[in-house]
Amino acid sequence: MKIASFNIQKFGKNKVSDPDVLNTVVKIVSRYDIIVILEVVDASGTSVTTLLEALNKSNRKHHYTLKISTRLGRTRYKEQFMFLYRDDMVDLVGSYQFDDELSGEGDVFARDPYILRFRCLNTVLKDLVLIPVHTKPEDSEKELDELYDVFQHIKKKWRTDNVMILGDFNADGSYVSKRDMKKIRIRSDKNFHWLIGDDVDTTASTGNNHTYDRIVVYGDDMLKAIVPNSAKPFNFQEAFRLTEEQALEVSDHYPVEVELKSITNTIDNPDGVEEEEKPRLVVVDEDLMELKRGNLLLEREKLNLEIQILRMKMAKKNPV
């Protein structure tokens, strides 16, 4: 099961009104079972509806459902977190709008995380919590550190630590230094596993090669549920053979993605290494079945013959 986060860069009417851009976005989203889209800025909601309709028109076998936050932000500029997920692959079992002011930490987040909880139907991990992030660049260190408290709050609220934090962390370049990264609790706590390396370019622009977009999971159970080496950016410019100009019309970020192991294709071998399970074949030996049927016929004929002999003997003893 593939999960992704995508900062789509000011998603609104202008994006969906361009058929080429809309088509590319649909192709990107269609790669995933769950995707959270950042920077949804259309207050009317029409662009969201347009995308959902185009997505389901393009995906006949898998129906997508939408779950979107309220408009978030301190100023007139607002954004929404938009989740799109295949409802034959997961069930939405919980949603929660975190409010940092109610948590006692003050107004830390420019956009408070909108957190969803899913029951996964076909993966080794049944319970999954997704915490999306889009930090304000100049406050990214403080916001990322606060995510530790968000995690603890969710762990207590929902009694689970199967948590994935994903989104645009803005934790690179001039925003957060390597020294400052060490101060961030979800970085210094070794129970948190950062799946996207520090030297991975997640931007579509050739003007920089920063690692802004990240995926972080908590605990060994979550880490073991991840398909090895599946966490990476998806270079849609290369995959769809777009020019840089065409790619930047879609977004200045790449989606970052990860895959959870399927319950039907993994087994544990004696060495503790998980491998793909080979299909189990049920073979019917038709020759053997035919032989058994033949034996039954012979037994029946033998029985009929014995009955005929017995009748003949009875007739001799009792002549008419």
Describe each PLM feature range:
Residues 1-269:
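Divalent cation-coordinating acidic motifs and surrounding scaffolds
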